[in-house]
């Protein structure tokens, strides 16, 4: 998905620690780049990308609620500024901060229990109105189709890399 400024986002919600490994984050970041440009297009046209893993537990293990991963020029400690960002959010950390309350909201099943009025209203619309239920069914169908397409593409790429195709 893209925002109004053209930044591209891939939000991955991971229940299992194995699904949120650093190399998987790198893979998703590279996948976004590969799907941004056409052959012959200038590399300066690459979009700013954000891969966001929302995880059930603190998969990086430093006890923080959020981790911003970026590349650095090691010799001088400067940011590399390739506009590629990876963020890990520990949804298990549900303290009384803005992020902590948002993580609490993500775990709520009932719109009445959600702190954010905007999110509560949208959850109510999606879960408790016929229009919302219809919309969610269409969205789930699209997500399924996109996942199947992505899986097929990844499988072909892996088969080619392994010399099996």
What does each model-identified segment do?
Residues 2, 9-14, 94, 99-165:
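Short, charged alpha-helical interaction segments and adjacent helix-coil junctions
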Residues 1-85, 95-97, 150:
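Accessory alpha/beta interaction modules
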């Amino acid at each position: 998905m893209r925002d109004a400024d053209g930044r591209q986002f891939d939000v991955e919600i991971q229940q299992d620690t194995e699904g949120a490994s650093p190399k998987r984050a790198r893979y998703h970041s590279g996948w976004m780049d590969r799907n941004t440009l056409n052959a012959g297009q200038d590399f300066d046209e690459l979009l700013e990308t954000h891969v966001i893993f929302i995880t059930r537990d603190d998969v990086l293990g430093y006890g923080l609620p959020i981790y911003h991963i970026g590349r650095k020029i090691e010799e001088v400690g400067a940011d590399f500024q390739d506009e590629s960002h990876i963020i890990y959010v520990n949804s298990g950390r549900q303290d009384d901060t803005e992020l902590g309350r948002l993580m609490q909201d993500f775990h709520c099943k009932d719109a009445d229990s959600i702190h954010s009025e905007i999110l509560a209203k949208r959850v109510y619309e999606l879960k408790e109105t016929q229009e919302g239920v219809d919309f969610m069914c269409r969205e789930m169908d699209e997500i399924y189709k996109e996942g199947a397409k992505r899986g097929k593409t990844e499988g072909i790429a892996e088969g080619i890399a392994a010399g099996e195709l």
